[in-house]
Amino acid sequence: MTQDITQQDVLDAPFMKEMMNTTYDMWKLGWDELNGGNISYLLKEEEVRSYFDLNQVKRTISLDFPVIELANQYFLVTGSGKFFRKIIENPEECLAVLRVTSDGESVELLWGLSDGGRPTSELASHFMSHIVRLKHDPNHRVIMHTHATNLIAMTFTHELDEVQFTRTLWQMCTECLVVFPEGVGILPWMVPGTSEIGKATAEKMNEYRLAIWSHHGIFGAGESIDQVFGLIETVEKAAKVYNLVNAHPDGAKQVITDQQLIDLAEAFHVNPPNKYFS
């Protein structure tokens, strides 16, 4: 006997509320214009089972890349071409609950994309990054991509060297080194929506939870939507400070010093790699 579950029950799910509220917040911040940005949220089977009949597959969508490592895993993802500002109004059209097939060659749609749409065009980057982050953190659950305004601007005016870029961010806001002590990865400009950018992003995820797409946006990874949103929010704040400082005719008169960064790391028990201080 299948459980009779109404749409309202589904929209009351904590993971659904998180996705709806966060995407709206991201739009209000100006990070996700038009259909920009995408999120994927790894769900536990017991979470999904409480709201969906797992035997009812609406349709199967083939993948251009195999993800056997994610076989039988469940994801809540944003849809391709969907506006973040509309998700809170029409989640069933704009979101999707997917299950990766046992062979990793396809995903099964359990809910959502009611207009016949498809999952985010960046699904390759998301799945590849999930695979890598799960190897480093078994509690990993979220990949988030957004067009953070000040960070994009910074990729035009700052050298795209990961060590120097990270150091600059750390020097702009005291909390930065504490929030992302491993630093940030940087990709050169690449065509989005391809397996190539997915592979390059996943490679960065071996070392970082944040991968900047030059002149485009940022990818973030973490254990919850709040954690990843906070990571990106912190980087974006530092980039804004950098842009404000560099707009001043005299630039910066002082910054947080290396010794102060070292003292900060010791005080908060984080271990930034030595490469940032050599």
UniProtKB/Swiss-Prot annotation:
Lyase in keyword set: yes
EC number per UniProt: 4.1.2.19
Record InterPro entries: Aldolase_class_II_sugar_metab, Aldolase_II/adducin_N, Aldolase_II/adducin_N_sf, Rhamnulose-1-P_Aldolase
Subcellular localization: Cytoplasm
Cofactor(s) this protein requires: Zn(2+)
Enzyme active site: E122
UniProt GO molecular function: metal ion binding; rhamnulose-1-phosphate aldolase activity
Pathway note: Carbohydrate degradation; L-rhamnose degradation; glycerone phosphate from L-rhamnose: step 3/3
GO cellular component: cytosol
Superkingdom field: Bacteria
Note describing how the cofactor binds: Binds 1 zinc ion per subunit.
Keyword Metal-binding applies: yes
Catalytic activity: L-rhamnulose 1-phosphate = (S)-lactaldehyde + dihydroxyacetone phosphate
Binding site residues for Zn(2+): H145, H147, H216
Keywords of the record: Cytoplasm, Lyase, Metal-binding, Rhamnose metabolism, Zinc
Family statement: Belongs to the aldolase class II family. RhaD subfamily.
NCBIfam families cross-referenced by the UniProt entry: PRK03634.1, rhamnu_1P_ald
Function: Catalyzes the reversible cleavage of L-rhamnulose-1-phosphate to dihydroxyacetone phosphate (DHAP) and L-lactaldehyde.
UniProt protein name: Rhamnulose-1-phosphate aldolase
Organism (species): Oceanobacillus iheyensis (strain DSM 14371 / CIP 107618 / JCM 11309 / KCTC 3954 / HTE831)
